[in-house]
């Protein structure tokens, strides 16, 4: 019995060493692809006011019908994500007593752990996803239906300053883009990355683009249409060029 345990242990250690060696071999030989978003020399601050990053992903500051301002990066996000992550943050205000639309971009660096499955992050901060759908947004000058996005209708209970607990609702829209690739599916993104690493020796440098707005219950479709107009106007400036859709 002891000899069998020894054989199993040695075999397991050998496999672990071989796997570790293979990972090191891949890391040394896999090159990083070009980003599918525009990077500019615009610094972003953390919520505490310190410099978070000297470069950022470009988000247009002027769009028809919207005023905008730069957003700050939460300290928790900065401490959780790898230091080579590049961010983009901006809030768009359409006036007319409508809630602002928050735009966010997370661009991975050599450390591919910058981007996680959106469902995990959202539920981790208290949101409940009520409905998940795939939608298409028409972008002027792009092929019809080329921007496919995921849409989450969500709800959350928050505590106000006076101690009262209230329910809020929101619409969250996102997709992923790299150089020459776009997908609304996290699983497709991961599979594409594996394919490119194994077949091309190249890791796509994915960006996770998302937009969020609060929404009154029952007005989610109206909110999505308003967000769609903003996204259609913004995305040609965010992405480096029209991409090839991937699923």
Model features per residue range: what roles?
Residues 4-28, 136-247:
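A short, solvent-exposed beta-edge/loop patch
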Residues 27-50:
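Alpha-helical transmembrane signal-anchor/signal-peptide segments
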Residues 34-41, 57-59, 198-200:
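Short, charged helix-to-loop "capping" segments that act as catalytic/coupling loops
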Residues 49, 67-199:
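Short, solvent-exposed recognition patches
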Residues 54-73:
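Amphipathic alpha-helical segments
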Residues 58-59, 84, 201, 226:
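Generic detector of ordered secondary-structure context
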Residues 64, 99-101, 205-207:
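Envelope-exposed proteins and targeting segments
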């Amino acid at each position: 019995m002891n000899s069998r345990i020894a054989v199993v242990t040695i075999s397991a250690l050998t496999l672990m060493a071989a796997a570790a060696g293979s990972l090191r071999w891949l890391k040394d030989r896999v090159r990083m692809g070009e980003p599918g978003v525009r990077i500019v020399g615009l610094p972003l601050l953390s919520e505490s006011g310190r410099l978070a990053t000297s470069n950022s992903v470009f988000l247009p500051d002027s769009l028809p019908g919207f005023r905008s301002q730069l957003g700050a990066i939460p300290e928790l996000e900065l401490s959780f994500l790898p230091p080579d992550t590049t961010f983009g943050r901006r809030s768009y205000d359409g006036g007319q007593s409508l809630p602002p639309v928050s735009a966010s971009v997370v661009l991975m660096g050599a450390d591919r752990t910058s981007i996680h499955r959106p469902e995990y992050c959202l539920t981790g901060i208290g949101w409940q996803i009520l409905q998940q759908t795939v939608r298409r947004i028409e972008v002027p000058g792009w092929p019809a239906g080329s921007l496919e996005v995921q849409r989450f209708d969500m709800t959350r209970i928050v505590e106000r300053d006076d101690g009262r607990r209230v329910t809020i609702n929101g619409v969250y829209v996102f997709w992923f883009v790299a150089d020459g690739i776009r997908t609304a599916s996290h699983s497709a993104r991961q599979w594409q990355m594996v394919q490119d690493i194994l077949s091309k020796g190249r890791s796509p440098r994915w960006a996770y683009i998302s937009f969020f707005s609060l929404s009154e219950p029952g007005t989610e479709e109206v909110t999505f249409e308003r967000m769609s107009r903003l996204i259609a106007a913004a995305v040609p400036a965010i992405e480096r060029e029209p991409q090839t859709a991937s699923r």
